[in-house]
Amino acid sequence: MAVKISGVLKDGTGKPVQNCTIQLKARRNSTTVVVNTVGSENPDEAGRYSMDVEYGQYSVILQVDGFPPSHAGTITVYEDSQPGTLNDFLCAMTEDDARPEVLRRLELMVEEVARNASVVAQSTADAKKSAGDASASAAQVAALVTDATDSARAASTSAGQAASSAQEASSGAEAASAKATEAEKSAAAAESSKNAAATSAGAAKTSETNAAASQQSAATSASTAATKASEAATSARDAVASKEAAKSSETNASSSAGRAASSATAAENSARAAKTSETNARSSETAAERSASAAADAKTAAAGSASTASTKATEAAGSAVSASQSKSAAEAAAIRAKNSAKRAEDIASAVALEDADTTRKGIVQLSSATNSTSETLAATPKAVKVVMDETNRKAPLDSPALTGTPTAPTALRGTNNTQIANTAFVLAAIADVIDASPDALNTLNELAAALGNDPDFATTMTNALAGKQPKNATLTALAGLSTAKNKLPYFAENDAASLTELTQVGRDILAKNSVADVLEYLGAGENSAFPAGAPIPWPSDIVPSGYVLMQGQAFDKSAYPKLAVAYPSGVLPDMRGWTIKGKPASGRAVLSQEQDGIKSHTHSASASGTDLGTKTTSSFDYGTKTTGSFDYGTKSTNNTGAHAHSLSGSTGAAGAHAHTSGLRMNSSGWSQYGTATITGSLSTVKGTSTQGIAYLSKTDSQGSHSHSLSGTAVSAGAHAHTVGIGAHQHPVVIGAHAHSFSIGSHGHTITVNAAGNAENTVKNIAFNYIVRLA
């Protein structure tokens, strides 16, 4: 079941804290609450709050608008916690308050040692793993070294094979040298083949030299694979040269056989020797090529083995570094663990790690027992609470008055000491005394029993008789009434009693303690003129008891429930400067405000028209006035007048003409007949007698034509005029005259100035509005 925490949140000046949120953040798990969950409560404007909090431990955080959150403290709610304020729970003792500081420090040291031990264990595991990795890397390196050794052996074997190939090439060279010697002898036998034999001998010598160089190169390649391959290639090239030289020797020998038959046999032998030398050279070349290939393969294999070995060596170095780092980390963790253990030992030695008692410090165990007599156990807050609850039920020492019905154990009969005697013991003792009286006194016992064992029987009887009413007519009248339910006796006349109905209203009025209460019940009391919540005009700034000014302030709805019915919001209206208006039939809600204003209306304004008639100004003769003299000189007009004419139409037809031939063939041949006018298209001209008649002709008339005209003629006609304006004056006659002007009917703009107060008011007297608290 949840525990109610309620109260008023106040600041240091006692004022309620407004706009604040109370947050409860769970610090640990409980049966109903999960750790780190947050609950919140928003106090009202008066700072009041109320929360039903589940069992658990919470951090209290205050969040005020406009300020950062603040941690107010920690509260613990137990299953048997009593309702209270937040301050009560914040100020209550917690388990941490009852725990010694040295114990908390020791717990922290133990936690740190445990953490360091975990780190050491992890570091140890890492170190073992790194050592295993290093061992594996070492094995891989060893395997790579073995591979490199095998590769070196293979390279050495290849070098030996290359050396054998070189030796074979050398043998071939020696054979070639021998054949060259034979060729030299053959050359000596035939003088005609001397030069050829000498050339063959030189070539053989060169082959021998090259073979020796090839042998030396092959020997060198045994130590360096790359050099061996290069020199083997050189040997191959030299062998090819030897082959070419042998071919040349064969050619020269053949030439010698052609020149000298005697040397044919020698040349043939020389050719066979050269052929043998060529075969040997080819064998040497093939062997050299195989040696070069084997050397190149050995070089590649060696390079691969070296690269693999380098990679594995790098990996081994990295593993070694990792192992070194893991070892360093493990050593550092071990040192920290050792230091933590040392600190724990120091603290343990400081407190002796012994149980504390009343004479020495040490470790104590918590206990919730309330009946223990141990001096080595520490009481928990729960035990303290149980004792305090029990103590609160006891009477204080300075107030011996007891409440309720105290009890005490009943002592045995005959007990005679300072033990408290209860009523049972006293009653038994009295009975024993009575039973122990002589038989002669038994009559008193019987009389006392008959009188109810009242020791003050005489006084009781006297007092009872004194309280009796003497018998008279009034009592007789009352005794004669018949009793009935809800009847009230009254006297109609002297010694004459009657009954009347007693209603609930009558009983209520009779139950009142004062006249004011009766008037209040009847609705005629001092505070009954106005119902709770009605605004009352009050002619003073001093408010009567039971009333409050209406100034927009909040009130306690629980303390004044009737006032809360009128104002459910818990806030009174601010009536300062406001009047009360009856709520219209529609459009307004109760307690709604309406700003000041005037009813919308219009004004009519006009100005009467007035005809001012025709007015005449006064007459005045200005006489004759002369203007001032000024010579304007000679002025030229602007150059203008230029214009052009548009042309359109056509020219007259002209150009028609004809051509005369002037020559004509007559009967006696061509002759010149001079010039004559031809009136038609054909004319005859008579010449001399010897010339005969000549005929002249002309062409028909052709060539008559006309031209069309269009366009604009050239602009012309621009000219200017020179105008002379000499010095002169103009007389101006201004005679006596008057001016008339008409002012017709017209209107004027009228401005109406503002008037009135700052707000709409009527004649009034200022009162305070108060309201009755109820």
From Swiss-Prot:
Residues 603-615 have a biased composition (Polar residues). One of its GO terms (molecular function) is structural molecule activity. It is found in: Virion. SUPFAM superfamilies: Carboxypeptidase regulatory domain-like, Receptor-binding domain of short tail fibre protein gp12. Its main location: virion. The keyword Protein biosynthesis does not apply. Residues 159-178, 240-295, 589-615 are annotated as: Disordered. It comes from the Viruses. The keyword Flavoprotein does not apply. Interacts with Tail fiber assembly protein. Forms tail fibers that play a role in primary attachment of virion to host receptors. Assembles with Tail fiber assembly protein to form fibers attached to virion tail tip. Fibers are about 35nm long and have a thin, uniform diameter. There are presumaby six fibers per virion. They bind in a reversible manner to host molecules, attaching transiently the virion to the host until tail tip interacts with LamB and injects viral DNA into the cell. Belongs to the tail fiber family. This is Tail fiber protein. It comes from Escherichia phage lambda.
